[in-house]
Amino acid sequence: MTLATRSLIKNLSSALGAQAEREQLIALISIATQTVAPLWPLDSAIAVNPLSGFEEQPFEEVLPEAAALFGARPTLSLNEWRTLMDEGRIDQVSLRKAVVNALGGPDEAFALLGPDLNAYNLLVARLLDMEAEDVPPVRRALSPGMATLARWLAAFFDRNAALRLPGRERGLYACLSEALRHDPALLRASNATGRAWLENAPADPVDMLILAARRDAVGPERRLPWLRAMVASLPGWAAHLRWRSEHAGPATSLGAPACMADLMALVALVQGVVQPAPRAVPDPDCPEDVEAALLVHCGVAQDAPAKWPEAGRARLRAVAALTHAQLGLIFQEAAESSFLGQLAPQLEGASARLAAPQSTLRPEAQAIFCIDVRSEPMRRALETQGRFETLGYAGFFGLPIAINPACAAPARNQLPVLLSPSHVVPERAMPGREAEATAMLARHAALGDAQAMLDTTKSGAIGFAAAEAAGPVAAVAMLARTLAPRLTHRLRQRLIGERGHVLAPAACNDQDHERHDGQGEGIPLAQRVAYARGMFALTGLSPQTARLVALVGHGGCTTNNAFAASLDCGACGGHPGGPNARLMAAILNDPAVRKGLAAKGVDLPHDTWFIAAQHDTTRDEVEIFDRHLVPASHVADLARFERALSCAGAQSRDERAARLDRTADDLLTGAAHWGEVRPEWGLSGNAAFIVGPRALTREVDLGGNAFLHSYDWKKDDDGSALTGIMTAPMIVAQWINCQYLFSTIDNEIFGAGDKTTQNVVGGFGVVQGSGGDLCTGLPRQSLFRDDGTPYHTPRRLAVIVHAPLQRVQDIVLRHDAVGRLVENGWVNLVVIDPWKHKAHHWVRGDWAVRPC
């Protein structure tokens, strides 16, 4: 709890009267809402830090607190950490440093307790040698009351996947409190007192919470943790509700209004009807028992400590008292140090080489990829094919847009969820392909209608008759998708057509952008120039570009995957980045924009042409868009570039297949197979966000574990470009990193569990089995190998910046969104000094010359 929160509670507690109590509770509800992060729906799923509401506290303090609140594990088990160490993901030197740090420094660690015995030996024994029993998480199954409430929540929030729940227009609390009064399962699970509580519930949710607080004798000082526990009792549904309240458009809530107070009140109502079962709190190792076991392990008599100085006995007690969370954090710090210890010296050497004169030869082509970690292997492979240069930029290419589809569908935001779209860009048929576009949209609509009809047959009274009629057809389709998935996929694509081949964002085929402004669509010339200039400023891309420059968005390609959007571009709101790449390429090829750029000092060569592409991260293939617009003078350049991309894709596919323990050909099959549970590792393994020129990392094999954002500090005099990078893409990368970290630590609570036992609910989320709480994180198959060992190493994001120390420090101190992550240890900030070429690690407000 922050000082500001404590002050608020104290001030409000001193007020008297019902109105003051109500105002206090409303203020606390707002704070308690932050207990969970927003959960985006499946069609625009993005990664978020599930503990983002705790970022104002130090990371090491949050782990046990959040574990207790959500009933989760605070860290991997000691046996899992030992497995990671056996695999070489933690080195001995880094573990030694982490142990010494945990003990307070070398003096404390190596002071003799007895003959040949010190605290360092004791702690290493606890970490590596002594028998370790996995401490179970403090979780409980949903009570009958909570399971019933979860079922009604699914009905209320449903997106037309089932029959409409009557009374939704009255709001979540009013609708469901009435439904619960008549729910037979809930009534059977309650007694007379519970039924009376249910029958006499107040009509207002805040009044309901006040009544429940008084009943449970929850005083003002205890009400915030009490409300947080309400949220944490159904964290998935609470997270969905937070997204709905804070990030969804008004249309989402139309006809079904809901707020977090409604959910808290319903939880309080149900808890009054059916008391939740107490959590089974595991018995932690008794420090005295651990102390005795340590002495036995080290061959020391049990009465020996009585002869030690008090300082020695205190050190023994301190090591024995370390909790499972504290031991796990030592391993985690060692894993982070191992990664940085290997990477930092390589970057220091590369920084020194940057001082030497660089080649002035014009590249054959340049490719600007998304910063996504999956771009790194493809970039590295492409650079081996010839004189190709690659850069990294946020995959929405700096365009704050929403795409208005040509079909009858809502506008789709193509930008980070931290931002709101400034422009709505219409999707239109390419010139001369209007008839083809009309036919393709009709086929898409027919396919959608058929899918809707199929979904309808899966429930309701018509399901039996429909199953009889549709069974033979469905059986043929099932066999085809199972036995020949790639062929089936190609036939399906040929039948319905490739949308990107006949439709495009309007700026890709309209020269007169301004004509859309009266309708609120399109981007005015001045802003198009600004967005184009921003790309050069943030990446450090020289205006002396290659003849061919590719803007490469990315997206995944999977079949029958509820989490498909999580493999698309997070910077594009969980959608493929192709539309943004096409729009930016069209902007940069526009003579009016070129003229505007030249006036601002960005004078592009007359023979430079920008093309748009999309990197399929599941198949390692790159699709080129709008090739019909490429001038005849650049056709040969494009052909050479495509050959290089094909070779790079094959190389990257081989590398990725080895990590998946599969063949490269099997990856192509898996992308089309509806039974594939692991089409790719996604962003598993992500460990670093590196900001600097490509020359800093070009000679380093980062193994697809790093976000790479191009940046040249010499071209950023006022630090504005670096500020933009650290306050937006870096924070998104930290969200991704934390989702992978916590989904690995406890996949049942912070993740989504096993894919094979999941069901989609309401069209927006997944649950395990037939119902219950919404899953908030990543499925097990995205993080763990088939044998159960973690593929992803849980470690905090290493933010590595090649820039002057003072410039980075100013940003950390000036921007709270960055400062709290750095100061509270949610990221490890490392700066490579561009003059002395040394890595400096920010440790609680000061710089250390070597990373931890």
From Swiss-Prot:
Keywords associated with the record: Cell inner membrane, Cell membrane, Membrane, Metal-binding, Transport, Zinc
Binding-site residues for Zn(2+), renumbered to this chain: 370, 372, 554, 569
Membrane topology: Peripheral membrane protein
Pfam families: DabA (PF10070)
Keyword Cell inner membrane part of the UniProt annotation: yes
Domain of life the protein comes from: Bacteria
GO cellular component: plasma membrane
Entry cofactors: Zn(2+)
GO-annotated molecular function: zinc ion binding
Subcellular location field: Cell inner membrane
Function statement: Part of an energy-coupled inorganic carbon pump.
Subunit note: Forms a complex with DabB.
Family: Belongs to the inorganic carbon transporter (TC 9.A.2) DabA family.
Protein name: Probable inorganic carbon transporter subunit DabA
Organism: Novosphingobium aromaticivorans (strain ATCC 700278 / DSM 12444 / CCUG 56034 / CIP 105152 / NBRC 16084 / F199)
Gene that produces this protein: dabA
